[in-house]
Design a protein with these regions (language model features):
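Glycine-rich phosphate/ribose-binding loops and adjacent secondary-structure elements
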Residues: 133-198
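A structural motif corresponding to the C-terminal end of an alpha-helix
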Residues: 79-89, 119-133, 156-159, 184-194
C-alpha cells in the first residue's frame, strides 16, 4: 500500500493580540497579514522574523469590500515592491462582486473574475518579483477562470507557481467546490480563510 504525504505550510493570520504576535514571532511561525489592516505589524515582522519563517501578504480586498472602501492597486504594488525580499508570496488585489449588503447581480458575478484577472496581469507586469503573486479563484466563479490560470504562461513560458482558492464558507457546495478545484491543480495552492479538514 502506497502512502502519499501531502506537505503544506500553515500561515497564522491576524494581528490583533500583541502577546500572540510576540509568541508567533519568537517561534518562527509563518504569517499571513493584510496590507490593508496590518501594515504596522508587517513592518515589525519584516524587521524581526527569522529567516525560515514565511510571510504571506494579503491585499485586504474582502476587508475593503466589507468596509465599503477601495484599495489602490498601484499603492499595493509599490508597497509590495518595498518589502518583496522579506515576503514569500502575496495575493493579488482581487475583485469581490457587488457591494456589501446588496444583492449581487448576474453582471456583478460575471465582471468580478474578469476584473480580478486584469488586476493580476497589471500587477504581474509591475512587481519586482512577480513569481510570488497569487491569483485567486473564488467559489461561484466560472471554472473557465481557473482553467485560464492553469493555462497562463509568463513571457518565459513558465506557468503559475501558486493559485489561491477562495471558498465561500457560508454557502452550500463547499466540499464539491474544494474537491473540484484541488483535483485540477498541480501547482501550489492556498485556501483562503479555511482551516478545517474535510
Amino acid at each position: 500500500k502506497e502512502i502519499v504525504l501531502i506537505m503544506f505550510d500553515l500561515y497564522f493570520a491576524g494581528a490583533r493580540n500583541k502577546f500572540a504576535d510576540a509568541y508567533l514571532l519568537k517561534c518562527g511561525a509563518n504569517r499571513l497579514q493584510s496590507q490593508l489592516l496590518d501594515r504596522r505589524n508587517i513592518s515589525e515582522w519584516v524587521l524581526k522574523k527569522s529567516d525560515n519563517s514565511k510571510l504571506f501578504i494579503d491585499s485586504g480586498a474582502y476587508s475593503a469590500y466589507t468596509k465599503g472602501v477601495s484599495i489602490s492597486v498601484d499603492d499595493y504594488i509599490m508597497y509590495l515592491n518595498s518589502i518583496t525580499s522579506k515576503c514569500t508570496i502575496f495575493a493579488q488585489l482581487d475583485t469581490i462582486p457587488g457591494q456589501m449588503g446588496k444583492v449581487k447581480t448576474k453582471e456583478d458575478r460575471l465582471n468580478a473574475p474578469r476584473l480580478s484577472w486584469e488586476n493580476f496581469l497589471y500587477m504581474y507586469d509591475r512587481l519586482k518579483e512577480p513569481e510570488k503573486l497569487v491569483p485567486i479563484f473564488h467559489q461561484g466563479e466560472d471554472y473557465d477562470w481557473l482553467w485560464n490560470m492553469l493555462e497562463w504562461r509568463n513571457n518565459k513560458e513558465e506557468p503559475l507557481s501558486y493559485i489561491g482558492i477562495s471558498p465561500a464558507v457560508d454557502v452550500p457546495g463547499l466540499e464539491e467546490f474544494l474537491t473540484k478545484s484541488f483535483d485540477k491543480l498541480l501547482v501550489i495552492r492556498h485556501c483562503f480563510e479555511y482551516s478545517i479538514f474535510i
